[in-house]
Amino acid sequence: MVLAQRQKEELNRAIADYLFANGYVKALNAFREESQLAGENDRKYDGLLEKKWTSVIRLQKKVMDLEAKLNEAEKEFQSMQNAIGFGVAGAAPGSGLSDRSDRRDVDAIPRPPAKFTLTGHRSPITRVLFHPHYNVFVSASEDASIKVWDYETGEFEHTLKGHTDSVQDVAFDPSGKFLASCSADMQVKLWDFTIYQCIKTLTGHDHNVSSVAFLPSGDFLVSASRDKTIKMWEVSTGYCTKTFIGHTEWIRSVRPSPEGNLLASCSNDHTIRIWSVESRECQVVLRGHEHVVECIAWASHPQNLNSLPSSMNSSLLLVSGSRDRTIRFWDVNIGICLFVLIGHDNWVRQLVFHPHGRLLLSASDDKTIRVWDLKNRRCHKTLNAHSHFVTSLDVNRLAPYAITGSVDQTIHIWDCR
């Protein structure tokens, strides 16, 4: 394979950085002369060769694993054909083939014991989040760092340093190229995740920044703060383009709607507000919680919630968790609470919908995660997840894994089955 001139230049500089970092001075001087490298290396080449090398090894392992799974799937497919006399594509309605597949998806929830327990942070974990495309996830902590991990092997990959106080939240853009983080240092940082480098620092909040999220387009991100405001930032320039004002206390979380035209925010003032992105006006105030509202999440598949009246299947549905220990389900269009889920014995800290939308997972200070059956509006399973408060939870959309983070400074990776 022939490399383009720019690729050759990047490879040569990565090699030069490797030689310099390892003290191979004679080899470095000879290499610079032979390759005609001029000037000093940019910081973006720091450790680049090692990163590429480990990435290649990880991808090779991934390819081998996928090939093995493909072989197993082909064998299973062949055995099914032999057993029933026709292919899966020809399965008749009610034959049970698709039903079994659906049941496997429904049952794919975290099961004990934890596959891996990861340590490395020196303070409580504040957020865990899967990458939208790669087999890695990130963890944020009160130790002011963000760490990158391989969820299939449990191996540590990298540490992102730059914040000077507790990192409160992280978010990936839809492409997975950019990571946003926010901190008690009053800053929002934008990282190029492909090279693990901070490319922008966004300033403007006057207090702890507690939440950050990208709009679905990826062109803008929003942040919420203890200064009682929400700010919208243009990713390409880093400029603040809008400020949303209305909450009377610390805003704990902000989340854009699936279409990106609305924002939902929750606060210490016990309310949830729905905002128009275009006009910046608050359209609805949702009241009902009796304590701080810690977390919110939009239902991305309301049509799958067949416990609701059919007239509501196209509604905008939002779920919220509070220090009052309850989870509330809201119809945003008409501003009413549809039902309340009760079961946790302490603050509800994080809410995540299962990929198919019919289950909800919650993390709590009662040290558990709960799986809720939304059709029957009851707790389907309780998992004793950590030895201390469970602060964060995420479910992978592409692979059968879940992750949790805790005040006990550990991260657990769970198999979903």
From Swiss-Prot:
It holds the Pfam family WD40. One of its GO terms (biological process) is establishment of mitotic spindle orientation. Its main location: cytoplasm. PROSITE patterns: LISH, WD_REPEATS_1, WD_REPEATS_2, WD_REPEATS_REGION. GO terms for molecular function: dynein complex binding. Residues 54-86 form a coiled coil. GO terms for cellular component: centrosome; cytoplasm; microtubule; microtubule associated complex. WD repeats lie at residues 120-159, 162-203, 204-243, 246-285, 288-340, 343-382, 385-417. The keyword Translocase does not apply. Keywords: Cell cycle, Cell division, Coiled coil, Cytoplasm, Cytoskeleton, Microtubule, Mitosis, Repeat, Transport, WD repeat. It is found in: Cytoplasm, Cytoskeleton; Cytoplasm, Cytoskeleton, Microtubule organizing center, Centrosome. The keyword Chaperone does not apply. SUPFAM superfamilies: Lissencephaly-1 protein (Lis-1, PAF-AH alpha) N-terminal domain, WD40 repeat-like. Residues 7-39 form the LisH domain. It comes from the Eukaryota. HAMAP family: lis1. Dimerization mediated by the LisH domain may be required to activate dynein. Positively regulates the activity of the minus-end directed microtubule motor protein dynein. May enhance dynein-mediated microtubule sliding by targeting dynein to the microtubule plus end. Required for several dynein- and microtubule-dependent processes. Belongs to the WD repeat LIS1/nudF family. This is Lissencephaly-1 homolog. It comes from Schistosoma mansoni (Blood fluke).
